[in-house]
From Swiss-Prot:
Protein name: Elongation factor P
Biological process per Gene Ontology, one example term: peptide biosynthetic process
Coarse class of the protein's main subcellular location: cytoplasm
NCBIfam families, sorted: efp, PRK00529.1
Keyword Protein biosynthesis: yes
Source organism of the structure: Prochlorococcus marinus (strain MIT 9312)
Alphabetic keyword roster: Cytoplasm, Elongation factor, Protein biosynthesis
Family per record: Belongs to the elongation factor P family.
Length: 186
């Protein structure tokens, strides 16, 4: 159990059978009446954000999360197979469990898997990854100044908007949080 007075950004709690992460919190001490804690909570499973108010000192069940470092080894019949780097156990995850990050998974890539009571809650990919451009419109000389973008398909099948000067075969860095181009990789 954790007191609402001890809430911090990133604290995980259990409410109504779901795991929530505290995104924002504010301790309010009105001149009249009792103090309370106003929070903004994000569901770890669905990503929904709700606002909830707790009485000061109210006890809430703290969610104990485990973080496991896994390496993506291969894909078999629609499931992504990962290997635990310490125990060498295999774990199978569906693309629904991985979420939108499945389009960036490459063999040999290491990810962090967040577990709660043995159940996968979320898969954390590296913030930036380097991938090869496999398909895009050809770049034309002098396209660097206009600042335009074009779609490019990467080696994993993901589609990202890249500058006009990027051509097929180049290695680029991509931000996995918002699917954006970060730059060329040398």
């Amino acid at each position: 159990m954790i007191s609402s007075n001890d809430f911090r950004t990133g604290t995980t709690i259990e409410l109504d059978g779901q795991v929530w992460r505290v995104v924002e919190f504010l301790h309010v001490k009105p001149g009249k009446g009792s103090a309370f804690v106003r929070t903004k909570l994000k569901s770890v499973q669905s990503g929904n954000v709700v606002e909830k108010t707790f009485r000061a000192g109210e006890s809430v069940q703290q969610a104990i999360l485990e973080k496991s470092n896994l390496q993506h080894t291969y894909v078999e019949s629609g499931d992504y197979v990962f290997m635990d780097m310490t125990s060498f156990e295999e774990t199978r995850l569906s693309s629904e469990q991985i979420g939108k990050g499945s389009k960036y998974l490459k063999e040999g890539m290491e990810v962090n898997v967040i577990l709660h009571n043995g159940k996968v809650l979320e898969v954390e990919l590296p913030i930036s990854i380097t991938l090869k451009v496999t398909e895009t419109d050809p770049g034309v000389k002098g396209d660097t100044a206009s600042g335009g973008t074009k779609p490019a398909i990467l080696e994993t099948g993901a589609q990202v908007m890249v500058p006009l000067f990027i051509s097929v075969g180049e290695m680029i860095k991509v931000d996995t949080r918002n699917d954006s181009y970060l730059g060329r990789e040398n």
